[in-house]
Design a protein with these regions (language model features):
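Internal metal/ion-chelating core segments
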Residues: 1-13
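C-terminal subdomains that position terminal phosphate/3'-OH groups for nucleotidyl transfer/ligation
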Residues: 11-174
Length: 174
């Protein structure tokens, strides 16, 4: 349960069935925050062939490790951090930020920036002429808009932007 020992265990041939770690460098894992999420994800990033399920880790942790590895990218801008949160959730973003030793995600949370549908200044009820999936499409368009223009996340400004965003989206769809 301590991935920081992987290097030594691999050298002794103890993990051959679980990890094919050609040239994987597990040094430095012990310097990371002492959470299972952080250390197991760092092991996955250093050895992409690593299968967390082989260690019988909880399914939720395995999914988080895999998602974080799939969406991993260093040097994100603030807008890219917001998109990551919007698309994959706070947990994945916090984990990546911890691994990259940045407080960008924490700052976004502290400011209360709009990164989820729940944080939008409008709701589906503000679009009575739309039905079903069209309501969801509109709200997602407005979320993308709010991610790019955080100062525009007011009911008045989003309702004003909605018709042109909808028209542009439907032009692309046709």
């Amino acid at each position: 349960n301590r991935p920081e020992y992987f290097g030594r265990m691999l050298a002794e041939g103890l993990l051959g069935a679980c990890i094919r770690a050609e040239n994987a460098d597990f040094s430095g894992l012990s310097a990371l925050p002492k959470t299972p999420e952080t250390r197991w994800t760092a092991a996955k990033l250093r050895c992409p062939a690593f299968d967390p399920a082989a260690f019988r880790l909880p399914a939720k942790l395995c999914r988080l490790i895999e998602l974080t590895a799939q969406t991993w990218r260093e040097g994100r801008t603030e807008a890219e951090w917001k998109r990551l949160i919007a698309e994959h959730g706070w947990e994945t973003a916090h984990l990546q930020a911890d691994l990259q030793r940045t407080d960008a995600v924490r700052q976004i949370g502290l400011r209360g920036d709009c990164v989820t549908l729940r944080q939008l200044a409008v709701t589906g009820a503000d679009f009575p002429t739309l039905c079903g999936k069209d309501v969801g499409r509109m709200l997602h368009l407005l979320l993308v808009y709010a991610l790019e223009h955080p100062d525009q996340n007011t009911k008045t400004q989003l309702l004003a932007a909605a018709p042109s965003l909808w028209q542009e989206e439907n032009k692309i769809q046709d």
